[in-house]
A protein has these predicted regions:
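Acidic-aromatic/histidine active-site loop/patch
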Residues: 152
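Short, conserved catalytic/metal-binding motifs centered on acidic residues
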Residues: 7, 125, 144
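Class I S-adenosyl-L-methionine
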Residues: 1-94
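Short, solvent-exposed helix-loop connector elements
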Residues: 135-142
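Short, hydrophobic alpha-helical segments
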Residues: 156-167
């Protein structure tokens, strides 16, 4: 699970209207941001045969030597090339596990196919609308650098429900 940090603030004159917690030195606002969303398993968004981003010949050669229990390409690279400390960022995606967090330079590889996640799979993992216009940017870059839209909507909803709706108009 990826933890995220959100900085929130409110004017001091509005603190009396919202939930707060105090310690020895100060009083500060509190907000519940536990969402308890259902996890998105890789198998739910996996598109078999989508070869939008195939692996390079080198990495495909390493991928072909993966074994049960490998979590990334480093184990196979150690067996094939004698370099077990390389390719550890090339993580495998397993159908029965939560899809790995999308990073800007997404290097995830489906365990079952020698390729990277496709753009549509990344959109599904990141809860982005399929018709979003990324202009000239790569989908993996924008999704990896952004807070997912569903999460932003939930944060905004919690701020309204727990803080803004309590402040007299």
């Amino acid at each position: 699970m990826r933890r995220r940090v959100f900085f929130t603030a409110i004017r001091k004159d509005l603190m009396e209207y919202i939930p707060t917690r105090a310690d020895l030195f100060e009083t500060y606002p509190v907000i519940d941001l536990d969402f308890n969303e259902e996890p998105i398993l890789w198998g739910e968004v996996y598109e078999p045969g989508n070869m939008q981003y195939p692996l390079s010949d080198f990495k495909r050669g390493v991928w072909e030597h993966r074994q049960e229990g490998d979590l990334d390409l480093s184990g196979a690279n150690g067996r094939v090339n004698g370099k077990p400390n390389n390719l550890f960022n090339d993580k495998f995606l397993f159908k029965d596990k939560v899809a790995n967090t999308v990073a800007a330079g997404d290097l995830c590889i489906p365990y079952d196919e020698p390729r990277r996640r496709s753009d549509s799979e990344i959109l599904s993992c990141s809860s982005w609308p399929r018709d979003y216009d990324f202009k000239d940017e790569k989908v993996r870059y924008i999704c990896g650098m952004s807070v997912p839209p569903v999460m932003m909507a939930q944060v905004a909803s919690r701020v309204y429900d727990q803080w803004l709706s309590k402040i007299p108009k």
